[in-house]
Amino acid sequence: NLARRLGEVIARFHGLDSARAEGLKTLISELQLASDERLREWVTKHYADLPSLPVAKCPVMVHHVPRFLSMRRSSGESKIALLVFDGLAVDQWVQIRQSLARRTPKLGFDESACFAWLPTLTSVSRQALFSGLKPREFADTIDTTSPEPNQWSRFWQDQGLRVNEVLYRKGIKRIDQLADLDAGLSEPLIK
């Protein structure tokens, strides 16, 4: 997984002191340019095949994520949470993951990456992510994120859950909001 490895390298680079980082700036920039070019070539050849690939091992595109989570529930996992960080680069996630691992060693991570729909617009990616639908299936609301709560709830109702067993929270930006989230996730009814 080139993106993950590159993210790890860039995160380590950003963790260096300025004197050590200065000597690597050009190399890191060249590495990023080369990986961008490789991705462009790969997308040109393979992107059209992605939407229809199977989801069994992990989601390939954002609209596969809900089905993948549903399969995990069907395999016996009683509670599943999906955390979405808008606009987060892989190297930024590496730093967050490392910090969380230090602070909460019992917390486990199940990480994978998937492709967004092109062009990568927030409203398209988020609606695909929460609904499990392809963009043409939500064309009427493609320019907004407001349908997300209903799409998330509808997806899980279609999988057999009741509306009061599904939780959706958006816009958690402050630490003081975490207590409310924790209370919601701790509800016995929430799946």
Question: Predicted regions: what is each one?
Answer:
Residues T44-H64:
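Glycine-rich phosphate-binding "P-loop"
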Residues I96-R103:
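Short secondary-structure boundary/capping segments
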Residues H64-F68, G87, A128:
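Residue-level preference for alpha-helix termini and adjacent loops
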